[in-house]
């Protein structure tokens, strides 16, 4: 009887461990257009300071007055703190200059590389993704 209980327990443990594997997953950078950089000026609408990534949302107005809403990601808060960033560094309405690595599909989404704050200070978020090694 105890062998049967042990076998059931072992099977349940293996099943739970297998079911938990997706929790350890993380998205890659295949969606980003590696090496491409786009610079723009915009108005901050929201700064989201949260795990697993922080997000900067901002509006960019083109020469015709059309507004495009961008959302770009950075790293996690602890990493951003190490880079000198903070939870309260952006306020809605802040005018910023942003350099992003956009996604390949052309949507207004990307990885934030650099931002020039309203006070003129440049903050670096990340290095652009690199292509495969030769």
Question: What are the residue ranges of the model-derived segments?
Answer:
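Bacterial N-terminal signal peptides
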Residues: 9-22
């Amino acid at each position: 009887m105890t062998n049967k209980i042990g076998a059931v327990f072992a099977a349940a443990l293996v099943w739970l461990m297998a079911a938990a594997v997706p929790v350890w997953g993380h998205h890659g950078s295949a969606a980003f257009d590696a090496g491409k950089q786009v610079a723009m000026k915009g108005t901050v609408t929201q700064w989201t300071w949260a795990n697993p990534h922080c997000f900067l949302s901002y509006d960019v107005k083109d020469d015709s007055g059309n507004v495009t809403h961008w959302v770009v990601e950075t790293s996690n808060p602890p990493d951003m703190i190490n880079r000198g960033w903070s939870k309260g560094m952006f306020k809605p309405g802040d005018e910023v200059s942003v350099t992003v690595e956009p996604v390949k599909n052309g949507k207004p989404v990307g990885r934030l590389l650099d931002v020039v704050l309203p006070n003129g200070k440049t903050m670096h978020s990340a290095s652009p993704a690199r292509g495969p090694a030769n």
